[in-house]
Every structure is written in structure tokens, then in C-alpha cells.
Amino acid sequence: MDSNTITSFQDILQRMSKMQLESSSVDLNGMITQFERLKIYRDSLGESVMRMGDLHSLQSRNATWREELSQKFEEIRWLIAECRNILTKTENSFEQITFLQALQLLLEVESEIRTFSFQLI
């Protein structure tokens, strides 16, 4: 994984963990958990592309893998919608910057996951 992406994930997660949004903290904790799982999934896909042995095992369980990939794209869309929702409601510049960066990162990660998945198909 690109070191800038790692830093971006860590930075956003750290800043989100310090926030108290007007909405419930459960929603924010859910977003943080989703971000962490997305990072792990993105890392594992990138590593799979690097190792040809994994390519064959992924192809052998293709139906499960495609379903998992579909779920990750749903999670990304949900996170994007949540970031946009928070951006429309907040007037706090710290929150705006954090969620704009989170939105940008989500779009980059979505693109990377698509690229990895096309290489694995």
C-alpha cells in the first residue's frame, strides 16, 4: 500500500476518534470501524495482486469473492453517503476538513479496489 494512503487512513481515523458529532457517537464509531475494515480489505486485495498463488485461490472461490467485493462497494457507498451527510450538516471547520479528506480517500480507495479486482478477474 502507498505510504501516503496509510498515513491518510491513520490520520483520518485518529481525527474521527477525537470528534463528538451532534449525531450519536455510535454512528461515528460505526464509521471508524467501517474505515478500519475497508483499509484491511484494500490491503489484502493489494497483496493478493502481488502474489500469483492467491490469484488462483481467489479464482477458485470466485463466487464468494465477487459477493464479498460487492459488499465492500456497498460499504464504500454507505461511507461516502455518511461523509456527505455530515458535511451538509456541520459548520465546524475541523469536521469539514476531516470528512472532505475522508471522502477523497474513499474515492481513491474505491478506484484502487476496482483496479485490483479487474487484475484479479
Swiss-Prot record:
It comes from the Viruses. InterPro entries: Flu_NS2. GO terms for biological process: exit of virus from host cell nucleus through nuclear pore. It is found in: Virion; Host nucleus. Keywords: Host nucleus, Host-virus interaction, Transport, Virion. SUPFAM superfamilies: Nonstructural protein ns2, Nep, M1-binding domain. Interacts with protein M1. May interact with host nucleoporin RAB/HRB and exportin XPO1/CRM1. Mediates the nuclear export of encapsidated genomic RNAs (ribonucleoproteins, RNPs). Acts as an adapter between viral RNPs complexes and the nuclear export machinery of the cell. Possesses no intrinsic RNA-binding activity, but includes a C-terminal M1-binding domain. This domain is believed to allow recognition of RNPs bound to the protein M1. This is Nuclear export protein. The lineage of its organism: Viruses, Riboviria, Orthornavirae, Negarnaviricota, Polyploviricotina.
